[in-house]
Amino acid sequence: MKIKDTLNMGKTSFPMRAGLPKNEPIWQKKWDEDHVYEQRQKLNEGKPTFMLHDGPPFANGNIHMGHALNKISKDIIVRYKSMNGFRAPYVPGWDTHGLPIEQQLAKQGVKRKEMSMTDYRELCRQFAMQEIDKQRTDFKRLGVMGDWEHPYITLQHHYEASEIRVFGAMAKKGYIYHGLKPVYWSWSSESTLAEAEIEYHDDKSPSIYVAFKVVDGKGLLDTDTYLVIWTTTPWTIPANYGITVNPRFDYVQVQVGDKKYVVAAELLDRVAEEIGWENPKILKTFKGTDMDKMTAQHPLYDRTSLVMNADHVTLDAGTGLVHTAPGHGEDDYKVGVKYGLPVVSVVDAKGYMNEYAPGFEGVFYDDANKQITQALADKGALLKLDFFTHSYPHDWRTKKPVIFRATTQWFASIDAFRDQILKAIDTVDFKPSWGKTRLYNMIRDRGDWVISRQRAWGVPLPIFYAEDGEPIIEEETINHVADLFGKYGSNVWFEREAKDLLPEGYTNPHSPNGQFTKEKDIMDVWFDSGSSHQAVLAARPELSFPADLYLEGSDQYRGWFNSSLITSVAATGVAPYRGILSQGFTLDGKGRKMSKSLGNTIVPATIEKQFGAEIIRLWVATVDSSSDVRVSVDNFAQTSEAYRKIRNTMRFMVANTGDFDPEKDTVAYDELGSVDRYMMVRLNQIIKQVKTAYDAYDFATVEKTISSFLVNDLSAFYLDVAKDVVYIEAKDDPKRRGMQTVMFAALLTVTKLITPILPHTAEEVWPYLKQPEAYAALADMPEAEQFDDESQLLDIWSGFMDFRSEVQKALELARDNKVIGKSLEAAVTVYPSEPVRDMLDDVDANVMQLLITSHFEIAPATTKAPADAEQFDDMAVVVKHADGEVCPRCRMVRTDIGTDPKLPQLCSRCAAIVEANFPDAVTNGFDK
């Protein structure tokens, strides 16, 4: 027999190397085959519901790091809630209609106008479903658990029917109307855009100052005076029908050479510098209200422009007199309608100037900028041309600039119930808290929602037209269309004539001959996803409305959060969510947006192959995702190192509880040693802290708390101390079983606590824990216990940990001075202050063992510390090399080796243990 055969050296099949890229898919396959998600739902039947509603990603392309951050965050929450007393179903969704899919088909050579609408839409559907299959595989590879076989998809028949009913509820309340208004228009997509479909990029634009000659100055201004406007869109000058001034501002008439001009008094110096006026002389000062209804000559056409009053005019830029084209701006439209001006758009759907811009017909609007500027110069009306770079709206899909253009569209009136929406926001809990202000301001300031789109792939607007052109939006017709969509899908709209889409026997006084036509436009895709609260939450029996949580990127304050809120309040009177948790964007390591053109993209699949999905999940749990998050391969390398520490600590506990049967070997709390009870109390603290952090969606605190406990409390202290007991003492020694009790409790608790973040690792540990549940995901979160001596233990051991830290400093100095090598070679004498002496009395433990030294003594209170002692605030420490020899079994330096003649190689402690438990060693001796 060898000496090592008498030691309880932990052995385990739990591998040191995780092999995550290879092993994760094996676990994921097992979860699918054993229906672990479904088992969890069954276990939670009858419990309170926690409803996290998945915002649907667009079904186009493989997932990126933003998707991973979002889906993993959701998975952590749902897994935690499922393990902590809630029924928390998770139904993933996909957004499937819209321009990107049409663009993808065009890239594949599909010619929309050369096939029937139904055939084209079928190609769109097939493409969307293929993309869903790709993304579903990607999301499952991240370890995200949910009802993947029954997702919600915005092209599903029942979904489209529910969306039509939401539209019907809004129409019934009078919120839907048809109107000619300026809207964001994408000439590159040939369609209107919602605010959520706009993104801003820097663009170079012309900046021009233009003079309009006064025609009727209302007795205040001479006809040889010029009103000066400033604009960055010269192409809209042909659409000018007015000039707007602020009634409260002061304006001045100034003499410059032989010309007279009018600008806002406060902007005179800036305008003079810009245009190059020398010594402008103020002739008159007056209020904007005095200029109301003056007229000025249009600089290009034989008509006048009306001067109007409105409060939207500011002094931030320009001249204080605003060029007003009611067909090309929201404020322009509002003031123009108030004053009875025509609403004219001078560009067509493709962005080319039309017949309302004589002299420029057929010219692309951006090219027209140059031609119109030249025409103004030829007429003597151009005072200054310059160029500047500014942030300008672009189509979020095509990345091309957009324009404001008046077209006849279908709108959802926000004014009609804006106050109700704002009140609903007050019922919602926001994380971060600034989200409330952001959403509130967006709703407060937003215009009406243009919901019609001039595209093919989407849900048709369920509107008919009578013979006289009167729109038909009636409860009866809308419900009938919803029923048809529920049965056949929205393609039925394109397959049948209008009369076959109307209820049988339907008549309308506006169609005496029974003739009807149908709307050609489709719904805004934000109306699609924004109806999910009714199409999914209210429709599926296992779900509930309103949701407890919507969790998406901060861009969704103007997207899904916004559209869902509007449709929900309109249709049901309440917000669709009780809480909103928003996240920032994922950027590269330098803080730049990831893009293929910059070559700085990192995709989850790459990280999974190199490190594993578990490392992405742990990374998600370490970052503050409430703001933008930087991503680099280095991040994952660092996270992988943090994971290694977690895994190694858990592996040590697995190995050293291998011979521990929790049913028969557990030591009662009251019978544990002081340090063991302290660790149980610390474990109790960890449970409380981690669950509080989970409840607050504070994953970083969850991870930090668990990692710190594993690395600092366990690995660097308790487990290190435990080796002398767990390895050395007899297998069933009460002290050993006590420490194993703590280790097992820590391992079981930590495994449960990390399951939401590291589910693959938790499942790998789980079989070693001998629990009744087949999977960690089917277990419940640990509950904190009540220990009567908790505060007392924390107080004592907090003092001891400070004491230990100072002794370790003294040991480190002794090591540096070559007095000792390892701490087990040390003999430590302390000269403590009275409070430290009392604390050491209270610790009630083997301090030598706790310090991992071979000798420890407390000097008598009357003894003064020698001059060479290491001095600390509350004690002095002397470290010497321990006297004696190293015991080959316990590795301590002992003076009693050989005192037992039967086992002369061992110290008396080891000899007693071996003699009692390994009689063969006594009889035959140890192998050499």
From Swiss-Prot:
Note on domains (UniProt): IleRS has two distinct active sites: one for aminoacylation and one for editing. The misactivated valine is translocated from the active site to the editing site, which sterically excludes the correctly activated isoleucine. The single editing site contains two valyl binding pockets, one specific for each substrate (Val-AMP or Val-tRNA(Ile)).
Keyword Isomerase: no
Protein family per UniProt: Belongs to the class-I aminoacyl-tRNA synthetase family. IleS type 1 subfamily.
Enzymatic reactions: tRNA(Ile) + L-isoleucine + ATP = L-isoleucyl-tRNA(Ile) + AMP + diphosphate
Record-given protein name: Isoleucine--tRNA ligase
Motif window: 'HIGH' region: 57-67
Co-factor: note: Binds 1 zinc ion per subunit.
